[in-house]
Amino acid sequence: MLRELLSPKTESKRVDGERPANFNVLVGKLSEVLVRAVDKPLGYAINWGRLWSLWPVHLETACCSLEFGAASGPRYDVERFGIIEAFGSLRQCDLMVVQGTVTRKMAPRVRMIYDQMPEPKYVIAMGACAITGGLYFDSYNVLPGIDGVIPVDVYVPGCPPRPETLIQGCILLQEKIKRTRFR
């Protein structure tokens, strides 16, 4: 198909500086060919970079934050799994780790933080409080989990979850990133 477009056809009279009639079709087909040739290897490289350099933002309201701190320490060293502890802007983070109870008053703020993160963005709900409301599930002001406010990619159960469980959740998130197609 590309050869047909590139082959010289009957000479049409055109004024100098004008493009041939099939120029736009040629550019469109050429871009399709390039996208097909580059899409898979480039997508693999970009997903590889994403899965080994997740920048988390923490929403800490309960004891799960202590376990995340333990996972970041030298014994478990969560950085070897690509969770980079960097302190920057929300617009640089691509992973939100929600740890603890989320109240109705906090829900708009959680959504605002999520909306400020760049695409692709991922969410880990860590602990029973973030997943189901925890001990305060029947309180009038506590949300029964954050999945009603923002989409959750990985649930890490426990009260509080052990660092090993958090690492397993990070590995599950990496598997999900591997399976997604680069956009």
Regions found by a protein language model. Give the residues of each.
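Iron-sulfur (Fe-S) cluster-binding modules
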Residues: 1-89, 117-121, 137, 142-143, ...
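Metallocofactor- and cofactor-centric catalytic cores in central/energy metabolism, strongly enriched
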Residues: 2, 80, 98, 102-107, ...
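Gly/Ser/Thr-rich loops at beta-strand to alpha-helix junctions
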Residues: 65-67, 101-105, 130-132, 161-164
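Short, basic, glycine/proline-bearing loop/turn elements
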Residues: 71, 92-100
